[in-house]
Amino acid sequence: ESIGLLPDGEKNIEHDDKQIINKHGAEFGFTLKEALATPTFYIVAAALCTMSMLVTALHFFQVSIFEHQGLTPSIAAWMFPLSAIIAVLTQPIVGRCLDKFPTPRVITMSLATLCAALLSMSMVSDLLTAILYAVIFGINNAFNMTLFGYLWPRYFGRRHIGSVQGTGQMIGVIGASIGPIPLGMAFDLMDDYK
């Protein structure tokens, strides 16, 4: 970038005062104060926070949910490494999707896989449906992990990425921390996950 070469065929923008600006370069970026003044920051933060809440709740209660649906704890436990392997294998595909499709479309794909994971979790009744859930949940985790690193520089640039992403990640971690609480409380009140 410093010698005029840009990634992915990006083009520079010529400013009114003949200054060349690369809107995706390292010199571009919102400060944290500027980012916090945009609705986009809160939309992205809310999306990532919500996804974190649900994913963490599923991780925390997977064994218990499977047990209540008639499966053994060992089957539930074996689905964790399967999901992890699927997530690792799927992340490059998610990265290609982010290169190829508009960002909102990929976020929609991520939310669709999260919905599919939630739905498939409710239908787990045997080993085959448990494996299906683990595969879908792994794909969802690949979307989440990739989006967490991608969205902040995509919308706010790289110059102040530490403070912007740090604040956004904090919101995501708060979501992950409180996510299991409502599900746990609901189970305590109703003695069931359905």
Q: Residue locations for each model-derived region?
A:
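Paired small-residue
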Residues: A117, L128-I136
